[in-house]
């Protein structure tokens, strides 16, 4: 995949954003997070979706932890082969797990590290994680592993727990892969539960804690693409997976990993390509050997090339409707001719298949040439992490990876191609027409490469100030004028933003309608703030405050998922010396005002590039970017503004540096228990007004706490208008808190407000010392809620854009349609959009909020370094401050679900973005009110299904890039589905539906022929996943909170699921699947159909893409069924009419 990043959280700015700030940003259109599984995540222009991933890191200066040793460089230890290897192990003697003292690590990090360099030049970092093994070292026997499992079982990990989602459980679901414009992530309970589920499922599927993991970074990326084969580096990243000389099966590595509870991924950046995987420890050595063949002797057979080109092309098609990717490609096009920043990194069928064929280029031969030239051992850095001794890991790595060839050629170097954007076209105003409804201004500077200044991190210092949201900040000033909603600035350190040729500094501001009309004034405000910083010069007080905050975070650093960790470390090995491998991208080491000042002084109007993104630009843009079809225009800066900015303009007295931060923790004492220790949360308060669950942490032993409350009200779901008013309320409350709570955020105290389906969710976490101050601030603002007419108008106008932007995405519309059919009394996004368009008043909002606060049931969970007495104070503060009455009767926090009739029902609707060829096809089978045992059996079924589903529908049939089966719990009602993201330019959605049915038929035969050994292996794999220990406290809290927020309270769910798994037989699996696929099966297909030649309009004519065009009227357009499925399906052409005739299933919780 091409690597994507999000801006924010600043990963881009590298300052940590508050949770609420991220939510506002998400709502208003600044991209703040992303996943990178061949996905496009997002960041503010210009680095919106380039290869790169979210590398949000805390930073810290910790001079007392610096090593006395020097960078070992070429003099570092070289692992020797054969007899030398034994000699090396013998030399260490009793220090069999001794790490390298040169490598600086956090005092909280229990792992051991060793650096080696193989004779072929490959550099490797070995990570031995023997924590929680009670002194065990070396290889354990299978019996010892079983003991280890039993010991760890009490931890009751969340990884594969049945996270029952009130909306629907998206287990094994990748449908957010391209959800890179997070402006549409509204704070709703389904998203709260989805977020919990995504975390658990991501760990189960991709980053399961305490799995063994490895990552390898090749120091070459898309910059090395030949001019006549754009996208070749990205294509090669795909092709090496397609079998090797030693293991020729095309899908063999994925199949091996799935069989043993693992996963893999890869990504291509400008100057790096990264591969990573995780797997159960028992199979780690074999997995390493299989994986290493990618780099030793991949087959890359001709037959696979044409099919995998389609996968790359589908990835590109999925990326095309993303404003992030469109802006990135436009920005790259501004580079000097011949500079690699201007290349088309994605690749597609045109560049990798059709054009080469036309020009007699042998793609297969060129692919192999590229591999031979650039996949050389001396360009590679490898990281492996496992519960093995360092000597064992060294032996394995030496034995396996020494086989990777070294061609002896110098690594490609692009450092001489500096100043890529030193062109007349850069310092202009670019108006761009977006896909989404949004107004945004991005100001960008191209600076000399900053990597060499990593010990000072000047751009981090600057971004910390530019992105500040407290008094005196840019955003505070613009918010008071109702011109802006969110601002992010900085450099995300992705390959697109920071490479050997330049570094970017960008400031992206989400504008209101009024702010769009005053965008020049907005830019002027930014320039005034920067001028103020330049006149004052770097401030040591500010630098040391950042150091203090980040020092706290580093010292009490929590562990991360192994696969994420090794991925990050293998990249860190490329630019950083040995002692800084773990810290180079996190810590601030030295205060050098001259370095900061040099970067700061370049941020002047005369060197800035301005991009104005707005639908209002439509009709004014006569240019079109080649690859993504982005409409844009180029203008000189208006004379009056250009003259002002070139003059010695005045400073703005409302802009100033932030005051000293009162939220920085200074007390890190671990508190004593004031009640008996418990394995799971216990209810310590239970009144008619609310209840509180509590668990004191005694496992991770860090001075942090998590506070979560759910304020439940029946008022919200009474009408679509009420749901919208609740969204407005939550977002105005977040807006009101942004400035006063920002200091807490930068002090590593985070909060998030979620407008749930049935109540307001408050989440607060961080160092426990000052956490009560933040919690009380939130509750105070909630109790005294108010809004001005200007803020109300600003938020409601933006909410219209947000709803619109959700609806134009095929994957989110498909989900909305599916849940509208299944969940009774659910208000769809279209209902909400219409209610908002019909008009709501500030008076109606204030009346709604008053009624909401008057009668509630409050449920909370407090975990961490907090006593039970302190925990009860949190609930008491909410009750006393809001002074509400209890609910008259108990209220369910889930919807009722309709019972689908037997048969195959199809709801086929037109996508709402006419410029989008992407279609989404989901085939869903409803099971019903089932037990926990049956849920676990369904999990096992989907785990069996995952790899053959990918192999059949993507690899062999090439139907689309995103292909996945899913376990679903829709308000407690079980089901499973298969989803394919395809394109109307390639396939009719009903062809895809039939192929899904074809796959399920073949899968039935596959599991019938499954051997007992293969069945037991998969059962063991799922058990192992569920037995994995939590990496940090937040994971345990997520799992427990999921039980509380869904009112199921089965805190030992994993133990029950493991017990169920041990009782299953192959016949249980086969019979369950057949029962749901038989004549009485309840099947629902949802098709959201894109625009392209294989799909028809309502009048029967072929549809076509209309770039940059969306339907202004947000309503479902039902499409007729084609003859392909007409004989076997029951069409749904009116959802309300269909569902009103159906029976309702009872409320159901999966607790037995």
Curated annotation (Swiss-Prot):
Required co-factors: Zn(2+)
Alphabetical UniProt keywords: Cell projection, Hydrolase, Metal-binding, Metalloprotease, Mitochondrion, Phosphoprotein, Protease, Signal, Zinc
Annotated spans, Disordered: 81-108, 133-208
Gene Ontology molecular-function annotations: metal ion binding; metalloendopeptidase activity
Entry-linked InterPro entries: Metalloenz_LuxS/M16, Pept_M16_N, Pept_M16_Zn_BS, Peptidase_M16, Peptidase_M16_C, Peptidase_M16_M
Signal sequence, start to end: 1-20
Catalytic activity: Hydrolysis of polypeptides, preferably at -Xaa-|-Arg-Lys-, and less commonly at -Arg-|-Arg-Xaa-, in which Xaa is not Arg or Lys
Catalytic EC class: hydrolase
Residues recorded with modification Phosphoserine: 86, 94, 96
Biased composition (Acidic residues): 141-198
Main location: mitochondrion
Catalytic residues, chain numbering: 237
Cell location: Mitochondrion; Cell projection, Dendrite
CC per GO annotation: dendrite; mitochondrion
Documented EC number(s): 3.4.24.61
Top-level lineage group: Eukaryota
Subunit structure as annotated in this protein's UniProt entry: Interacts with BACE1 and NRG1.
Family classification: Belongs to the peptidase M16 family.
Protein name per UniProt: Nardilysin
Organism: Pongo abelii
Lineage: Eukaryota, Metazoa, Chordata, Craniata, Vertebrata
Gene responsible for this protein: NRDC
């Amino acid at each position: 995949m091409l690597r994507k990043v999000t801006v924010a959280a600043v990963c881009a700015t590298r300052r940590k954003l508050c949770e609420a700030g991220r939510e506002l940003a998400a709502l208003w259109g600044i991209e703040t997070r992303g996943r990178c599984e061949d996905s496009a995540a997002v960041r503010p222009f210009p680095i919106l979706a380039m290869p790169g991933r979210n590398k949000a890191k805390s930073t810290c200066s910790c001079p007392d932890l610096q090593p006395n040793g020097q960078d070992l460089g070429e003099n570092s230890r070289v692992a020797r082969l054969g007899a030398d290897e034994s000699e090396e192990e013998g030399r260490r003697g009793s220090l069999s797990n001794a790490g390298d003292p040169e490598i600086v690590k956090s005092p909280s990090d229990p792992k051991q590290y060793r650096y080696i360099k193989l004779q072929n030049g490959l550099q490797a970092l070995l990570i031995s994680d023997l924590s929680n093994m009670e002194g065990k070292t070396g290889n354990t026997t299978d019996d010892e592993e079983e003991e280890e499992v039993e010991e760890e079982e009490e931890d009751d990990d969340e990884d594969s727990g049945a996270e029952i989602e009130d909306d629907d459980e998206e287990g094994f679901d990748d449908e957010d892969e391209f959800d890179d414009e997070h402006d549409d992530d509204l704070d709703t309970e389904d998203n709260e539960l989805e977020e919990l589920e995504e975390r658990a499922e991501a760990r189960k599927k991709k980053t399961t804690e305490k799995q063994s993991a490895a990552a390898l970074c090749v120091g070459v990326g898309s910059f090395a693409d030949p001019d006549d084969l754009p996208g070749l580096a990205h294509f090669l990243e795909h092709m090496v997976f397609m079998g090797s000389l030693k293991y020729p099966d095309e899908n063999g590595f994925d199949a091996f990993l799935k069989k043993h509870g693992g996963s893999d991924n890869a990504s291509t950046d400008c100057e790096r390509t990264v591969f990573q995987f995780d797997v159960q420890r028992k199979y780690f050595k074999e997995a390493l050997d299989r994986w290493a063949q990618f780099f030793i002797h991949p087959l890359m057979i001709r037959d696979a090339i044409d099919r995998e080109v389609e996968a790359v092309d589908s990835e590109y098609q999925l990326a095309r409707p993303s404003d992030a990717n469109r802006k990135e490609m436009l920005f790259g096009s501004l580079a000097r001719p011949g500079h690699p920043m201007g290349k088309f990194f994605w690749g597609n069928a045109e560049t990798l298949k059709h054009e080469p064929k036309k020009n007699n280029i042998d793609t297969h031969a060129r692919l192999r040439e590229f591999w031979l030239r650039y996949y050389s051992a001396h360009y590679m850095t490898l990281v492996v992490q496992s519960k093995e001794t360092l000597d064992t890991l060294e032996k394995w790595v030496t034995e396996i990876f020494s086989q990777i060839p070294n061609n002896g050629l110098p690594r490609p170097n692009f450092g001489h191609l500096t100043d890529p954007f030193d062109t007349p076209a850069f310092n202009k105003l670019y108006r761009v027409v977006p896909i989404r409804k949004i107004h945004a201004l991005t100001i960008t500077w191209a600076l000399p490469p900053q990597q060499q200044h990593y010990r000072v991190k000047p751009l981090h210092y600057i971004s910390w100030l530019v992105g500040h949201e407290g008094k005196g900040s840019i955003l505070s000033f613009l918010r008071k004028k109702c011109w802006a909603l969110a601002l992010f600035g900085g450099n995300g350190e992705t390959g697109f933003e920071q490479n050997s040729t330049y570094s970017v500094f960008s400031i992206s501001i989400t504008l209101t309608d009024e702010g769009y009309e005053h965008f020049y004034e907005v830019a002027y405000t930014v320039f005034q703030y920067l001028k103020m910083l330049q006149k004052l010069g770097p401030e040591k007080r500010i630098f040391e405050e950042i150091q203090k905050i980040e020092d706290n975070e580093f010292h009490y650093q929590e562990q991360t998922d192994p696969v994420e960790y090794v991925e990050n470390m293998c990249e860190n090995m490329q630019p950083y010396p040995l002692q800084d491998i773990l810290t180079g991208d996190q810590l601030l080491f030295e205060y050098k005002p001259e370095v900061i000042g040099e970067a700061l002084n370049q941020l002047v109007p005369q060197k800035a590039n301005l991009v104005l993104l707005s639908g209002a630009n439509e009709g004014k843009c006569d240019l079109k970017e080649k690859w993504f079809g982005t409409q844009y225009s180029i203008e000189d800066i208006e004379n009056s503004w250009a003259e002002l900015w070139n003059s010695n303009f005045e400073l703005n007295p409302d802009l100033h540096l932030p005051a000293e931060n009162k939220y920085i923790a200074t007390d890190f004492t671990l508190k004593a228990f004031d009640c008996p220790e418990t394995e799971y949360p216990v209810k310590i308060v239970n009144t008619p007004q609310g209840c509180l669950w509590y668990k004191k942490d005694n496992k991770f032993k860090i001075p942090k706490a998590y506070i979560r409350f759910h304020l439940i009200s029946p008022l919200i779901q009474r009408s679509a208008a009420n749901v919208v008013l609740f969204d407005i309320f939550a977002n105005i409350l977040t807006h009101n808190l942004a400035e006063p709570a920002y200091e807490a955020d930068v002090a590593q105290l985070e909060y998030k407000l979620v407008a749930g389906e049935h109540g307001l969710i408050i989440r607060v976490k961080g160092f426990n010392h000052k956490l009560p101050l933040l919690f009380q601030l939130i509750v105070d603002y909630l109790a005294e809620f108010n809004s001005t007419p200007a803020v109300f108008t600003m938020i409601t106008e933006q909410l219209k854009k947000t709803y619109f932007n959700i609806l134009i995405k095929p994957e989110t519309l498909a989900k909305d349609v599916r849940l509208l059919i299944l969940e009774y009394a659910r208000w769809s996004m279209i209902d909400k959009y219409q209610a908002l368009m019909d008009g709501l008043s500030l008076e109606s909002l204030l009346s709604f909020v008053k009624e909401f606060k008057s009668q509630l049931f409050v449920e909370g969970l407090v975990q961490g370094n907090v006593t039970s007495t302190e925990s009860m104070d949190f609930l008491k503060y909410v009750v006393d401050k809001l002074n509400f009455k209890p609910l008259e009767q108990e209220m369910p926090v889930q919807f009722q679900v309709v019972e689908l009739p037997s048969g195959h029902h199809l709801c086929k609707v037109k996508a709402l973005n006419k410029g989008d060829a992407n279609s989404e096809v989901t085939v869903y089978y409803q099971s019903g009110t089932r037990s926990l045992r049956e849920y676990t059996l369904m999990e096992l079924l989907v785990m069996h299904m995952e790899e053959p589903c990918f192999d059949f529908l993507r690899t062999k049939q090439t139907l689309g890039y995103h292909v996945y089966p899913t376990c679903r719990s829709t308000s407690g009602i079980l089901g499973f589905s298969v989803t394919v993201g395809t394109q109307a330019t390639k396939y009719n959605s009903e062809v895809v539906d039939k192929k899904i049915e074809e796959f399920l038929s073949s899968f039935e035969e596959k599991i019938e022929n499954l051997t007992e050994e293969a069945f037991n292996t998969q059962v063991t794999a799922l058990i192992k996943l569920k037995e994995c220990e939590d990496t940090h406290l937040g994971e345990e809290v997520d799992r427990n909170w999921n039980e509380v927020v869904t009112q199921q309270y089965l805190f030992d769910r994993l133990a029950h699921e493991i017990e169920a798994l041990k009782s299953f037989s192959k016949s249980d699996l086969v019979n369950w699947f057949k029962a749901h696929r038989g004549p009485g099966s309840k099947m629902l297909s949802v098709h959201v159909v894109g625009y392209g030649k294989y799909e028809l309009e309502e009048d029967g004519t072929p549809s076509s893409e209309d770039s940059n065009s969306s339907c202004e009227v947000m309503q479902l357009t039902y499409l007729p069924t084609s003859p392909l499925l007409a004989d076997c399906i029951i069409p749904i052409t009116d959802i309300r009419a269909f569902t009103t005739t159906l029976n309702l299933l009872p409320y159901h919780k999966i607790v037995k």
